């Protein structure tokens, strides 16, 4: 899927006031315009508001957390910084969409965290952040506070050329690769995976030798089970930590671009797994998936199906596609299981 789009600019006045005047919010906080656009399914930068965002604005230092859990009774953020105690950092519910927010001072980059959600039944479930940009290395499954706003890029020439590139006319030859099985270091005690940086250099040499123009990367978004090859995603906004950090992932993309190699990601918007820390029954109810089990599950795969009828779910997925293209400079997406999506 190649994405060419025009940004839509929204200017909304409430009783004569501009949104900036009406909101009176910090840049990292959820405002009325954010609620409106997310509810309409058109907040294409919602990942800048939901999730965990490091704050250092001269007045506050810490992390601002925000999560969509519309049917939760209560939500708290728990982590290393509060001994995983749900009583210490309760979150405030913001209407009308059921977004929970809180600011926790002095939380450092790299801290592990989850959301403790009290369901309508009174149960407590612990969920990873759907908008987390980094995840704990498996078998751990917590989210990890990180700042990806200052990634270093040196591919400006490639990005400028991309604006006018006509992929219908220029030649294209795509090399598909899965980092975890492409090549491994023999004799190591761990799994022997190449890191993002190691793979970038080794794959570039092979791709240039064979004359490919693009690489298509399989299984990049975070996932719990190695055997799924990345097609059962739990962290849609996080490059998997198996091969390194977000900075390492950005380095890989940048390295390919400097060598005039385009990058396509396999993207999985059709379904997601039932792992307890993931999106399934996120707030104790079908949140991201269809409530009707006849529509909400893939019987062959044992996975959940996104409810494309919900504006917030549409927004989650569209913003995710744009996130990879805008924030990580990815050049295109190969959409997985399209036929299964069309069945819905």
Label every PLM stretch briefly:
Residues 16-60, 94-176, 181-188, 198:
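The feature marks proteins involved in alpha-glucan
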Residues 61-65:
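Structural beta-strand segments of beta-rich domains
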Residues 159-169, 178-338:
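Substrate-binding/active-site clefts of carbohydrate-active enzymes
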Residues 75-77, 113:
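Short beta-strand elements bearing conserved aromatic residues within extracellular beta-rich modules
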Residues 68-75:
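Short proline/glycine-enriched turn/loop motifs at strand-loop junctions of beta-rich domains
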Residues 343-344:
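Conserved small/polar residues in nucleotide/adenosyl-binding loops
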